Swiss-Prot record:
InterPro entries: DNA-binding_RecF, DNA-binding_RecF_CS, P-loop_NTPase, RecF/RecN/SMC_N, RecF_2. One of its GO terms (molecular function) is single-stranded DNA binding. The lineage of its organism: Bacteria, Bacillati, Bacillota, Bacilli, Lactobacillales. The RecF protein is involved in DNA metabolism; it is required for DNA replication and normal SOS inducibility. RecF binds preferentially to single-stranded, linear DNA. It also seems to bind ATP. GO terms for biological process: DNA replication; DNA synthesis involved in DNA repair; double-strand break repair; SOS response. The keyword DNA-binding applies. It holds the Pfam family SMC_N. Belongs to the RecF family. This is DNA replication and repair protein RecF. Keywords: ATP-binding, Cytoplasm, DNA damage, DNA repair, DNA replication, DNA-binding, Nucleotide-binding, SOS response. ATP binds at G30, K31, N32, A33, Q34, G35, K36, T37.
């Protein structure tokens, strides 16, 4: 799949843009704070209806603006799509081929995009919440069921935690209602965890292959999922996972009431990246961590292709300068002829021109884009 046209109105500092893209490689050059990252964020939002930089959609509406409008023309192997997202201060709406969608889950997945930025190193060395967000965003865009269960889990979790707080403060007494919420949450959690195990198995396989390709070394990369309910295993059925989570909720009921929060479940789970069985967070060098982060992104590309039969867009936000020539070459060779790629950079030095042949180059300044070089 590829995005051949993008329209942007009032997205951060991008006031009004109409841009045609090359189906292969598009490079955007410009100084910092001119709008390069905002452009990739706009494409990412068009695909996933959420930002990788903020949890508040209001932050995306340009200064003095009342709304943000994004529209894209997408070419897929079997179909052509017109996608649109409208963000207002009251919320957001989405359209597919000019038909408004009642649910975001019907929209997400029409356009797949994988983003790689310098912040992705935090995926290996950062907090568990970053890795959980990674799973929900990346798996949600390729599987509608995962997206549904992740959204439903958040809703019921908030409801249960609010009720736990009422119990903790003595404003509620009925623990039967708490049991109902725990049972409902355990059922949704089981569906979510089952799918996480499944997707991480695929991702680990592809990431291991990609790491070998990038590092040219003998180390083996693997990904392990660590449920907060420790007796859950990858071989469990959804019914077995449900029962184990419900047992955990029941065992910890008094503690949860006292703390006013749910102490176990998918919102407390984590994933671990290992090199030869050792925790990469603790033992990997910065170069190894960079290779792991890159391998995960390449694995995502393969996972999207496996599950959708389409290659996603690849958004490289100021990462080429972070990669040495060997890693650049490995990345570009890996994606060559597969993905439509968008690259932002402050200058063209350091780009592996022997691999990137005939890109379309744009210049970005103060939120406006001009075509600098046609391929």
């Amino acid at each position: 799949m590829y995005l051949d046209h993008l329209t942007v109105q009032n997205f951060r500092n991008l006031k009004k843009l109409d841009v045609d893209f090359d189906p292969n490689v598009n490079i955007f050059i410009g100084k910092n704070a001119q709008g390069k990252t905002n452009l990739l964020e706009a494409i990412y939002f068009l695909a996933l209806t959420r930002s990788h930089r903020t949890s508040s959609d209001r932050d995306l509406i340009g200064f003095d603006g009342e709304y943000t409008n994004l529209a894209g023309h997408v070419q897929k192997s079997q179909v052509t799509l017109n996608l649109r997202v409208l963000i207002t201060k009251k919320g957001k709406k989405v359209w597919i081929n000019r038909i408004e969608q009642a649910k975001l889950s019907k929209y997400v997945g029409q356009l797949n995009a994988i983003l790689f930025s310098p912040e992705d190193l935090e995926l290996i060395k950062g907090a568990p919440s970053l890795r959980r967000r990674f799973m929900d965003q990346e798996f949600g865009q390729i599987n509608a069921e995962y997206l549904y269960f992740a959204s439903k889990y958040r809703q019921v979790l908030i409801q249960k935690n609010n009720y736990l707080k009422q119990l903790a403060k003595g404003k509620a007494k009925d623990q039967v209602f708490l049991d109902v919420l725990s049972d409902q949450l355990a059922g949704i959690a089981a569906e979510l965890i089952y799918r996480r195990f499944k997707f991480l198995t695929y991702l680990s396989h592809y990431a291991s292959d990609a790491y070998t390709h990038i590092s040219l070394g003998s180390e083996k990369l693997s990904i392990a999922y660590h449920p907060s309910v420790s007796d859950i295993t990858a071989d469990d059925t959804t019914e077995e996972i449900y029962q184990k989570i419900l047992n955990s909720f029941n065992r910890n009921k008094a503690s949860e009431i006292r703390k006013g929060t749910t102490t176990s479940g998918p919102h407390r789970d984590d994933i671990e990246f290992k090199l030869d069985g050792k925790n990469a967070h603790l033992y990997a060098s910065q170069g190894q961590q960079r290779s792991i982060a890159l391998s995960i992104k390449l694995a995502e590309i393969q996972l999207v292709h496996q599950l959708t039969d389409e290659y996603p867009l690849l958004l490289l936000d100021d990462v080429m300068s972070e990669l040495d020539h060997g890693r650049q070459s490995a990345l570009l060779n890996y994606i060559h002829g597969k993905t439509q790629t968008f690259i932002t950079t402050t200058d063209l030095e350091g780009i592996s021109w022997d691999i990137i042949k005939k890109p379309r180059v744009y210049h970005i300044q103060s939120g406006t884009i001009s075509l600098e070089k046609e391929n």
